[in-house]
Amino acid sequence: MNFFIIDKKEDLLGIVLTHAHEDHIGAVAHIWPYLKCKIYATPFTAALILEKFKEKKIEISSYLEVVALNSKIKLGNFEIDFVTLTHSILEPHGLSIKTPLGTVLHTGDWKIDPNPLIGSQIDEQKLKSIGNNGVSAMICDSTNIFSPGRAGSESEVRDSLLRIMEIKTNRILVTSLSLIHI
C-alpha cells in the first residue's frame, strides 16, 4: 500500500466524510487498517461505512463517530462545522473548518437544488454567514461547474424518467450512480 497519509498517520486526527457516495467512502475500509484512526460521518454515511467494514470482517464501531446533522466537532486545533448541502444522496455536508490560521470551506460534492428529492435544502444562510466571517481557502467539487446556466433539479430528472416509463410498453433498463432519481 503506497499512500502518503500512511507515512503521516501520527499527525492524523481522523477521517471526516462529507457523504456516502462510493467515490468518497470506497477506499476507507482498505486504508483504515493502516491508520486505525477515528472516522466521523453522519448517520446514513456511517451506516454504509459499517457495512463496508463488515464485508471485510473488520470491527470499527469503537472508532466510528456518528455526527448529528448540522453539528460541530473539534479535532485538535480544528473546529469542524457540518453544513447541509444538496446532492444526489442522503445527508451531504460541506465542512467549515476553523483553523488557527483561518477558515477552510470544503464542500464535498454538491449542487444548489431548490427541490431536492431527498433530504433538506441547502443551508444558504449558514454558507452566507461562513462567507461573511471570512474564508481563507475553499475546496470545491461540483459536477458540470463549467457548464453555463443553472443545473436542473433532481426532481426534473425523476419527472422525465417517469414520463418516459409511462409511454414505453416494452422493457426499460435504467442504470444510475445514484438511484434517488427514480
Regions found by a protein language model. Give the residues of each.
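His/Asp/Glu-rich metal-coordinating catalytic cores
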Residues: 1-14, 21-180
